[in-house]
């Protein structure tokens, strides 16, 4: 550096390489790569924790409180949905399924009676759907 100052005093123009300090330019590439590896040794959680320091304490505490509240609400909603699903399912099984089964049973009985009537009285009686004991419809007019 002293040579650069002495040369500057002599009035000779200096190259930019002479003016810049010789820092990392003299290090071999292997040492530079090792320096990069040393910087990357921190984990993702450490990096994220380090990033929180760039926000003010007030913002960090507000974000933490918002996260805690969101977690609390999600847990409450999960518990409520489990209870509501249990109540809805058991109520459906107790109140609605017996009605559905009885309706199916009634339809099956009606279908069996219709089939018996077709077998005993002939194929046209099943289609008429008339009342029992009523006169059968005319064969040409349906």
Curated annotation (Swiss-Prot):
Residues 1-11 have a biased composition (Low complexity). Residues 123-142 are annotated as: C-tail signal. Residues 83-103 are annotated as: TMD. The chain crosses the membrane at residues 84-103. The keyword Hydrolase does not apply. InterPro entries: Tom22. Residues 104-142 are mitochondrial intermembrane. It is a single-pass membrane protein. Residues 27-42 have a biased composition (Acidic residues). PANTHER family: MITOCHONDRIAL IMPORT RECEPTOR SUBUNIT TOM22, MITOCHONDRIAL IMPORT RECEPTOR SUBUNIT TOM22 HOMOLOG. Requires the transmembrane domain (TMD), a short segment (the import sequence) in the cytoplasmic domain localizing separately from the TMD and the C-tail signal in the C-terminal domain for efficient targeting and integration into the TOM complex. The N-terminal domain (residues 1-62) is important for binding to the unfolded mature imported proteins. Residues (49-71) of the cytoplasmic domain interacts with TOMM20 while the C-terminal segment (residues 63-82) binds presequence of preproteins. This is Mitochondrial import receptor subunit TOM22 homolog.
